[in-house]
Amino acid sequence: CYIQNCPLG
């Protein structure tokens, strides 16, 4: 993911 709170990237 683009957000830092995304565990899967």
UniProtKB/Swiss-Prot annotation:
One of its GO terms (molecular function) is neurohypophyseal hormone activity. It is found in: Secreted. InterPro entries: Neurohypophysial_hormone_CS. Keywords: Amidation, Disulfide bond, Hormone, Secreted. The modification Glycine amide is found at residue 9. One of its GO terms (cellular component) is extracellular region. Disulfide bonds join 1-6. Interacts with oxytocin receptor (Ki=1.5 nM). Interacts with vasopressin V1aR/AVPR1A (Ki=37 nM), V1bR/AVPR1B (Ki=222 nM), and V2R/AVPR2 receptors (Ki=823 nM). Oxytocin causes contraction of the smooth muscle of the uterus and of the mammary gland. Belongs to the vasopressin/oxytocin family. This is Oxytocin. It comes from Oryctolagus cuniculus. The gene is OXT.
